[in-house]
């Protein structure tokens, strides 16, 4: 995935997955 949330509009489901992954790393 070369684009981020700023470059592409993600659906809520995808955003939730990204947030979950970020929380895990944090």
Curated annotation (Swiss-Prot):
Compositionally biased region (Basic and acidic residues): 9-26
GO biological process: proline catabolic process to glutamate
Induction text: By proline, autorepression and catabolite repression, and is potentially nitrogen controlled.
Region (Disordered): 1-26
Catalytic activity: L-proline + a quinone = (S)-1-pyrroline-5-carboxylate + a quinol + H(+); L-glutamate 5-semialdehyde + NAD(+) + H2O = L-glutamate + NADH + 2 H(+)
Biological pathway: Amino-acid degradation; L-proline degradation into L-glutamate; L-glutamate from L-proline: step 1/2; Amino-acid degradation; L-proline degradation into L-glutamate; L-glutamate from L-proline: step 2/2
EC numbers for this chain: 1.5.5.2, 1.2.1.88
Cofactor(s) in the UniProt record: FAD
Flavoprotein keyword on record: yes
Keywords for the protein's UniProt record, in alphabetical order: DNA-binding, FAD, Flavoprotein, Multifunctional enzyme, NAD, Oxidoreductase, Proline metabolism, Repressor, Transcription, Transcription regulation
UniProt GO molecular function: 1-pyrroline-5-carboxylate dehydrogenase activity; DNA binding; proline dehydrogenase activity
Task performed by this protein: Oxidizes proline to glutamate for use as a carbon and nitrogen source and also function as a transcriptional repressor of the put operon.
Name of the protein this chain belongs to: Bifunctional protein PutA
Native organism: Klebsiella pneumoniae
